[in-house]
Amino acid sequence: HKGAHFIGTNPDLNIPTERGLLPGAGSLITLLEAATRVKPVYIGKPNAIIMDKAVEHLGLKRQEIVMVGDNYLTDIRAGIDNGIPSLLVTTGFTKPEEVANLPIAPTHVLSSLSEWNFDEN
């Protein structure tokens, strides 16, 4: 339909599962974008729309929050791009060997969330 809005949740091309990588929302959105020639408006991570709502809901300052995730492109960039400290856990999508080549470093990097000291951070 001409003039309809095209809203996407997130640009994740793949999602890790127990069976390996499967197509994520971004892969389907990319297909629809190519077919319709309409650019989507993403409302999920890493975009400000969802992050601003989360900060508002928490009622905290951005520096009092830590964005935790295993995917640099969505989870960690959500923190970086929105002024929120980030914690990359390398147990999922982003692997330990990729960390040194990331364009902007996360605030913290751990191999497991169990390494995080909740009393000190």
Question: For the regions a protein language model found, what residue spans apply to each?
Answer:
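Asp-based, Mg2+/Mn2+-dependent phosphohydrolase catalytic module
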Residues: H1-N121
